[in-house]
């Protein structure tokens, strides 16, 4: 008899030996929520029962498809309670295919061939502007080309308007000399040269270094005159 009573007492107090769960740990908390969600699925859902009651045989056959293609027809045919919330159709495109398409679009955005295909002007390209006034000698495209050819060989000339043109020199030093000589409009000619590339206008040190040794004498005299007048 003593053995039976002792065994029953051990069975009663066997749960006291277990340690309490520490819900501060994320693993224990996730496991608890998983068990609760599984138990919640086992509970009876009256809304789904009413939904299933409205289905016909055709709808049942169509609802066998995991995409639930026949539910829209059920909603259009019967006036169901507003409390029933139906999830929208899942996208038929698989996840791996969607990732491939996203990677392709990202690669197209980062494609370096697009910048290579667009023809950018060379570094030695400048923009020339001049004004025509009655009291001062008139300037035209021929006279502008003759002036700029004194700095070095010209590769191409593109007319932008009546009083402006884009000139591309063959070398960088010639372009630096032209820009440094005609940075501002002189009162005698109203003639101005500037860089077509925006970042080149900020790099004044490079243009000064190039023009100190390779600037023609005529340009030096014109720059000195402008400096004295200012």
UniProtKB/Swiss-Prot annotation:
Cysteine pairings via disulfide bonds: none
Record GO terms (molecular function): nucleic acid binding
Superkingdom field: Eukaryota
Pfam families (UniProt xref): DUF4523 (PF15023)
InterPro entries according to UniProt: Nucleotide-bd_a/b_plait_sf, RBD_domain_sf, Tex56
Transmembrane segments: none
Protein name: Testis expressed protein 56
């Amino acid at each position: 008899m003593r053995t039976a009573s002792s065994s029953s007492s051990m069975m009663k107090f066997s749960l006291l030996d277990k340690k309490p769960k520490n819900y501060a740990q994320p693993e224990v908390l996730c496991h608890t929520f998983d068990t609760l969600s599984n138990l919640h699925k086992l509970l009876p859902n009256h809304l789904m029962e009413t939904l299933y009651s409205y289905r016909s045989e055709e709808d049942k056959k169509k609802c066998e498809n995991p995409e639930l293609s026949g539910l829209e027809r059920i909603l259009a045919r019967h006036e169901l309670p507003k409390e029933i919330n139906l999830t929208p159709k899942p996208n038929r495109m698989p996840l791996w295919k969607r990732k491939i398409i996203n990677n392709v679009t990202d690669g197209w955005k980062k494609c370096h061939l697009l910048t290579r295909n667009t023809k950018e002007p060379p570094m030695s390209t400048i923009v020339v502007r001049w004004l025509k006034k009655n009291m001062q000698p008139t300037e035209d495209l021929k006279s502008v080309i003759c002036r700029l050819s004194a700095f070095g060989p010209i590769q191409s000339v593109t007319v932008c308007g009546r009083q402006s043109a884009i000139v591309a020199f063959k070398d960088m030093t010639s372009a630096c000399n032209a820009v440094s000589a005609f940075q501002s409009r002189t009162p005698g000619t109203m003639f101005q040269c500037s860089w077509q590339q925006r970042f080149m206008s900020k790099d004044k040190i490079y243009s000064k270094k190039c023009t100190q040794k390779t600037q023609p004498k005529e340009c030096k005299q014109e720059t000195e005159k402008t400096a004295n007048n200012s």
